[in-house]
Amino acid sequence: MYLTTNYCDFLSRTRIVRRIFLLVYLISNVYAYIVFTETGVLIGDYQGVLIIYKDQVVYLLMLTIMSYYIVCGPVFNCLSKVKIRLRTFKGLNSFAYILFFFQILFAVFNISTGSNAAGTDFQTGGVIRLLWLFLPVDYLFYIYYFVGREKKVSKIYLANVVIFILSMLSRGWLGWTLVLLYAELCFFFYSQKKIKIKYLILLFFLLIVAPLAFSLKIQLRADLYSSGIGGVISTLSNIDYIQSYNNFIAGFLSRIQQLSNIVFFYDHQQELYKFVSSDIVSNYAWEGLPQQTVAKLLGLDPGVDMHIFLYSHYISSTSEAVTTLQVGFISWLFLGTLSSVFYPLFVFAIICISLFLSKKLGGEKLCALTWIMIFLSIMCGWYNAYLVYMQ
């Protein structure tokens, strides 16, 4: 079986999907701004933290929205139009079986050690956990999900999808649903099918189930490894559906908005600049366990990862961090002249490299996947996730 890469109209036919995601993002940040003006405190990861420079919030909102539009709009569109000669690969079926094997190993490792789950300590799983940093099974699945999709879905394709979903649920993550939702919308609009009643029924079903899934996520985060499946069943049987739905909408918008992270970073920019300039905290280029691991092997000390530092220093200074906080795309621009010059160049470079590889290896379908990775990773300031995807 060949990996076909020539999807000439895939990006143009799926443009509406990217516009929908940008619109939802716009709504979430405007929602955050409204909450800020009414309460004077942040939401999301920084819920309850007082805003220091309230007069700058509207300015930061406009910067945030414009950054998303520029990077995910004109910059991506221009780079994706560059013509790259495609490569044709054989053996997609073989790759599918290999991926399925590694997905099972990854799931067994995570369940047996409690590693890679939402809210777990970063040291969980020991040295073996580093193997999965350089063999990113989840990202390999995303790539296969896009380039391996055909009109008639194979059994091994479905098997990979099932094991991926079960693996993600066992770890308490739900962010993957945005990637798969984006993918399915892309496939739907690319096929140019008419909207059928069954799709509307499916959409209605998903809207009904969403609050339950959100509650399930909370249960998995808190009690899966302590209470087991019994705790999940207990939560589901006592759900207040209306309250769950309200919590889901507010929680979803609070989670995907970036304004709260950017406002917090702006309020503390002078202090954070001192930490970065004195190498106590690393800059964007050293963000993530792979880079930090390489630095230690080379005998370097780039400083603490910014995302971990934000949590351990400002949110939970009395305990070791078990989570990370997003920075937001434009936040690094606030840390002096050098950062405001080299940071955009760094971002532009990794976007260029990733789009070149995407067009070379997977054509426009893989470029479409790269867009959602830019949307979810680069625009959140989550460069570790994006660089792992690139590898």
What do these predicted ranges mean?
Residues 1-81, 161-164, 177-210, 216-217, ...:
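N-terminal "leader" segments that precede or initiate the main folded domain
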Residues 14-24, 88-98, 151-158, 361-372:
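Membrane-interfacial loop-to-transmembrane alpha-helix junctions, especially the N-terminal start
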Residues 37-46, 78-82, 97-132, 218-229:
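Membrane-interfacial helix-loop-helix modules of multi-pass inner-membrane proteins that assemble, modify
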Residues 49-60, 119-134, 329-335:
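Short aromatic-rich membrane-water interface segments that cap or initiate transmembrane helices
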Residues 62-76, 89-114, 130-170, 176-193:
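Alpha-helical transmembrane segments of multi-pass inner-membrane proteins
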Residues 114, 118, 137-138, 310-391:
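Hydrophobic alpha-helical segments
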Residues 155-156, 174-182, 197-201, 235, ...:
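Hydrophobic alpha-helical membrane segments of integral membrane proteins
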Residues 212-343:
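Small-residue-enriched transmembrane helix-hairpin modules in multi-pass membrane proteins
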